[in-house]
Amino acid sequence: MPDFVCKVAATGVTVSLGHQLAKSPKDIEDCIVAGAKAFTHLGNGIPNEVNRHDNIVYTALVEDRASVMFIPDGHHLPDTMLKLYARAVPLKRLVAVSDAQYPAGLPPGEYEVCGAHARLEPNGLLWNPARNCLVGATTPIAKCMRILEERIGLTPDECRAIGHDNALALIDKR
């Protein structure tokens, strides 16, 4: 995997690690050294049960060379996890994303999303009832910022950094 990361990073693409099953923190370390700059959707895209000490979440929280991207939509992560990220990770390394996709902005109902059946609930939860799992997100980034402000206690300036400035810096646009 580090060879692949190195080749992709050499093209100027920002490489982010996520929705993966690294076998060890060493595998993650090798990818960071090879050019990976972030962790995608930290806390999601991993098995429901992971090793309680040796897992990507802990590794990402202490890896100073990579940003931590997360989805603060009120569905993907509990408030306790959002608070942990806000307290454990330096502000400059945090990047909030909405991950909003089809059917964002549409009324509650049944939809086909990336080939999977999905139900969009009135509260914005997009999930597959048969598999009891999330199928994506529909919450706009502005609402994600309100969640971080109102439920986690971040300031408007911190939210702007996490929801805008840090993302631009991550892709070298700031």
Task: Please name every model-derived segment.
Residues 4, 17, 25-158:
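Active-site-adjacent C-terminal substructures of enzyme catalytic domains
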Residues 1-7:
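Active-site core of PLP-dependent enzymes with the aminotransferase class I/II
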Residues 169-174:
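Short arginine-rich
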Residues 156-167:
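Short, well-structured alpha-helical segments that form the helix of a local strand-helix-strand
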Residues 8-19:
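Short beta-strand/loop segments at the ligand-binding rim of alpha/beta enzyme cores
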